Amino acid sequence: MTALGFLPPDSFNVVVLIAVFTLIALGLHFTFGMLNVVNLAHGEFLLIGAYTAFQVQEATGNVVLGILLAPVTAGTLGILMERGILRSLYDRPLDSLLATFGLAVITRQVVQLLYSANPRRVDDAIGGSFEVAGFNVPWWRLVIVIATVALVAGVSAILARTEFGLRARATVRNPALAETMGINVGLMRAALFAIGSAIAGLAGALLAPINTLDPQFGLLFLVNSFLVVILGGQGSLRGLVIAAAVLGGSLSILQFVISTVYAQIIVLVIAILGVRLRPVLAERIASYRERRSSAQGSGPGSAGKALAAKAPPHGQVHE
């Protein structure tokens, strides 16, 4: 029994898996959630980031430098991919899907030619663990959790509170109108794709020390990335975090009692049910809010408030 009573001894792994689900889907939030590109090469950007960390580690012995260079490498390749191939395919979803699928296969084959199919290992930059309230917490897993929280907070702030975020949201919602406002839509799309690719590369580098690295590394995360973004709602960062908590938490808890294969199947079923029920839940929530707003508006003094709201500001007269 742990200090928290009802939690299993290694329940910190629940938090870690939620962070992992959030981290792997955060890059896809840009390429698929915002740009609506069914990016089947998303897993390969994690792969590129992981192998960048491995290569730098082999060349210099400095895995931290490799992790820092991983998003640079993945982001650069993301720009090249967007400018060279996807630029003309935004209105052709099937063609973009086939293009990203082909690039994913090519990337895996190139990695296998360069590094073989033999498993590789990226060192844990910190090593060791510590105990908190009876939990054995590996330092590197704590780093993953902290990095995920920081990335989500940073992305949320950038998209909600900066000029870049305003332009990005305008580009995503109405590209034609954004162009009339002087926004370079092509450049914004390239920037968003590069950011998504860079975050995926960083995710791959951060996750490499706790996984075996081989050319199939990216495929481990591809399906769950799409599940999180789809269940959370395309373009919704808050929904992404909630979906990651539901799916990652469910998978981690189920693995305590059943095999990983059956746990993943149940998570898939949860995702399907979530997508199916989400419109119904959204409609009921909207209806509840409308009734609550109406009830508040019909309270004492509501007529006076309504007249006050309709009255012209002080010093102004309607013609």
Regions found by a protein language model. Give the residues of each.
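Inter-helical junctions in multi-pass inner-membrane proteins, predominant
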Residues: 2-14, 155-163, 190-232, 251-264
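Transmembrane helix-bundle core of multi-pass membrane transporters
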Residues: 84, 88-161, 188-191, 288-319
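Hydrophobic alpha-helical transmembrane segments of polytopic membrane proteins
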Residues: 23, 28, 74-76, 224-252, ...
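Helix-loop-helix "hairpin" substructures at the membrane interface of multi-pass membrane proteins
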Residues: 17, 133-214, 237-242
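Single transmembrane alpha-helix segments in multi-pass membrane proteins
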Residues: 6-56, 80-95, 231-234
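Short, non-helical or kinked segments that cap or interrupt transmembrane helices
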Residues: 28-50, 91-96, 164-167, 185, ...
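Cytosolic-side transmembrane-helix boundaries in multi-pass membrane proteins
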Residues: 6, 95, 114, 173-180, ...
